[in-house]
Amino acid sequence: MNIILLAISAALVNNVILSQFMGICPFLGVSKKVSTAAGMGGAVIFVMTIASAVTSVIYHFVLVPLKLSYLNTIVFILVIAALVQFVEMFLKKTIPSLYEALGVYLPLITTNCAVLGIALKNVQDGLNIGESIINGMFSAVGFAIAIIVMAGIREKIDKNDIPESFKGAPIVLITAGLMAIAFLGLNGSI
């Protein structure tokens, strides 16, 4: 598979949030400020890239040879949980302000279905280790793009007058829907 097409497809065409609808909880919960969204995007890029690499290696070199591939979901969850703990400890020591801003959403990366979904999708699509890493990294980049763009739009919306009935969740969901339609326009490009 062409690596460039895989990267563009993972980040834009098959965007993990706006096309596959995985990772909606942090997308809606952390996208209030661009700085927080960028921090969450960075954490997800790190975790999803490393998780894709580690889960692919474990799948190809441990689970398949031992005929234990039916355990991939459980093993992948454990790997992702360990990686998130590492990121949490790292952020707490090095960037405490970002750690505080992410709050409860940082541990929720463990249960972020986007991270687990991409790891499982890599296996399901039969990607090799290199392709899994590229797919994981650029799916995470797509996640970061979507959450940062949404945060920027939400900051602009908060500064404007909108009808009372649209304030809060309604305008956020309408905005997310319009973003999904915009990304859907890229569907025929690859």
Regions found by a protein language model. Name each.
Residues M1-L5, V57-Y70, L120-I133, N187-I190:
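Helix-coil boundary and interhelical linker segments in multi-pass alpha-helical membrane proteins
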Residues I3-L18, L66-A82, I134-A146:
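Structural signature of hydrophobic alpha-helical transmembrane segments
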Residues L6, V13, V44, T49, ...:
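Hydrophobic core segments of alpha-helical transmembrane domains in multi-pass membrane transport
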Residues M22-T36, V84-L98, M150-D161:
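C-terminal ends of transmembrane helices
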Residues S35-F46, Y70-F76, L98-I109, S165-I171:
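Cytoplasmic-side transmembrane-helix entry/capping segments in multi-pass membrane proteins
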Residues H60-G103:
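Ordered, amphipathic secondary-structure segments that act as subunit-interaction surfaces
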Residues E155-L173:
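Interfacial loop-to-transmembrane junctions
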